[in-house]
Amino acid sequence: MRVKLCGAAGGRLGTLAGLGRSGAAALALPGCLLYTRTGTAPHLTLDTLREVSGVPPVAQLTLPAMAELHDVLAEYKEGAAKFIGMPDTVLYCSLQDPVAPCPSGYNTNKTVSLWSSSGRMEMTASKFMDIQRAIQPDWFQCIADGDTISGEVTRKRAKKSVDRSLSFLDACLQLLEKTPELQGSVMFGTIEGGDVLEERLRSARETAKRPVGGFLLDGFQGRAMAKETKMNLISSVTAELPEDKPRIIHGVGKPDEVLECIERGVDIFESFFPFQVTERGCALVFGYDYLSDPKAEAALKQNGAQDLEKNSPEEDQEEEVVKADPEMTPFEIFLKEKRYHDDFRPLLEGCTCYCCQRHTRAYLHHLLVSSELLAGVLLMMHNFQHYFSFFSAIRDALRDDKLDQLKKLIFRQALQGPENAKIDQ
């Protein structure tokens, strides 16, 4: 596995080549992973997933879900990729599920707590590596003490998280050498330290001294950390890392945050954000065509997530019994709203996804208010494809030296919604 960079300004444009046991797969950078739940894309079968364009070659498994299958996979002996029916997919196993809450205060010097549907599991380095031996992933995040995202982490606690994580890393590296089933697997070192710059830098420098295949920037999930602090820490950490190894970040998915992290040297992101949007009954409609094309500008206005045509105050608002999720972002539309019941446009004008080519907003509104399972399937197909296409647009913008233009477009939509964002001439 090796990073080949093209030297574009504003981000690390290139390719992560030599992936998988065969070494034939490659991931374009900056890029994202395919988010899965127990090895399956949410709401989708393998057949419906094949209808989605731009699916990344690397799928993300989460350890809490896979740990429950440990005994089954250990008996199966052929690894999770073949077990889930995706033998040609490169698998990355992360320590936590980015969507699931992770209670604080349960890690110790010897164990890290995972939270699954069956409750809390305590994970030692030895038990962790036993599970990885059964999963046989191509990449996996090393066990680490990432309990530093509450916003109230002291310098002492940040230091402890780094010390514990380095201790876990050394133990797992020793076990990796003695595990023949994982000789083709790559371990990613986890960089911790909360919001304490000195500890973040120490974690990055010490982790970079170990024989890891890449780096995982952890602890930047959620809103506990101020945005300016978060971005300054990411810049400082990536400056300490070798150029020839990939950098993954967990818990960052919104388009504006993704662009800021890319500018600061991050390579790979998760794709949990489209899943969260789908679970809210929403569709991604933000524009990412940064070229000065009048047709693109017109389509962007037409696809506005914050339509000015809101229900007027005179209308009976009691009919609007379903309220939007408070976590909803300006990049999406809430299709349960009554105004979509007779909106016969596709979710996104110009979108080539399976859903937009065949169905309308009105039909999705009907499926959602009727609690039909098909709603999740169609929304997931659209949201995944739109999100994957966004990363393709980022790479094009880097290649064309237009990242600033794309960033302006995305940031205007973050503030105003797609309808009111204008594309600079």
UniProtKB/Swiss-Prot annotation:
GO biological process, one term: tRNA-guanine transglycosylation
Main subcellular localisation: cytoplasm
Protein topology in the membrane: Peripheral membrane protein
Binding-site positions, Zn(2+): C351, C353, C356, H382
Any one Pfam family match given in the protein's UniProt record, by short name: TGT
GO CC term (a single one): cytoplasm
Chain's role: Non-catalytic subunit of the queuine tRNA-ribosyltransferase (TGT) that catalyzes the base-exchange of a guanine (G) residue with queuine (Q) at position 34 (anticodon wobble position) in tRNAs with GU(N) anticodons (tRNA-Asp, -Asn, -His and -Tyr), resulting in the hypermodified nucleoside queuosine (7-(((4,5-cis-dihydroxy-2-cyclopenten-1-yl)amino)methyl)-7-deazaguanosine).
Family: Belongs to the queuine tRNA-ribosyltransferase family. QTRT2 subfamily.
Protein name stated in the entry: Queuine tRNA-ribosyltransferase accessory subunit 2
Organism: Gallus gallus (Chicken)
Name of encoding gene: QTRT2
